């Protein structure tokens, strides 16, 4: 059992880092890091010539173009061209920039052509096999990097025990991340008539390594015939970019300007969990009914 002296010391240390980080973020401009997933030799999900890396780069550049029109927002990109960027470098870019927000954009892809819908992830732990598969997919890019074992200190995205062993380094930002993720999904549903699979917590390395609120957005499934066409279309990219940009600006107004809008606590905003497998296999009629409402499925355990 730690002594009272050690407990007091640790408490002071935590306060020091909390205040230090808080002041480091208090810049004249709201700084957003936009991260287009995959790139270069890592195409991400592919179906019928549609590549995830191309879609997400286009969407990120469009988001940046919208945000840069706002003089109070500074945009930082992890990549602006078709190049491979390692997960550690992506996190380092965000941390060195002392960003206020980290946005990583991806597309989903599975063997089934029936799965569809958007979903947005925040850092957290989950024991469901479905979500662990997604975590493996997004973390698997690690193996393309040289000396990955040394860089990531034995982190193995294919080992569920490793995933479950990830520590949440940014619990203080969890509420903000969920708030942003919820607004993004709401915008997709209301503004773009998309089917939302919800907001979820998941042990994704790049979110764990960035010391700021952050989300990983899955724009949809390139493996779904209709959704794949929408994701790769100019209309789809424009709509998704606007929905994400609007959510970011709303987040900035709520949190960065010193005025936090009243909202439900994290505990009170978590409804009963919905089985994601049952959603993927539901009928088209059922999906159409669901598409008019956003289902938030923040999985704590």
Indicate where each model-derived feature is located.
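Flexible hinge/switch segments at interdomain interfaces of large molecular machines
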Residues: 151-160, 216
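Catalytic-core regions of hydrolytic enzymes
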Residues: 25-155, 170-174, 178-182, 229, ...
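Solvent-exposed beta-strand motifs enriched in subsets of small alpha/beta binding domains
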Residues: 284-301
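Short linear recognition/processing motifs and adjacent strand/loop elements at protein termini
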Residues: 2, 23-25, 257, 261, ...
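Conserved HRD-motif arginine in the catalytic loop of eukaryotic-like protein kinases
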Residues: 278
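Bacterial Sec-dependent N-terminal signal peptides
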Residues: 1-30
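Structural motif
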Residues: 31, 100, 212-214, 295
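Active-site-adjacent mobile loop/cap segments within catalytic or ligand-binding domains
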Residues: 33, 44, 162-259
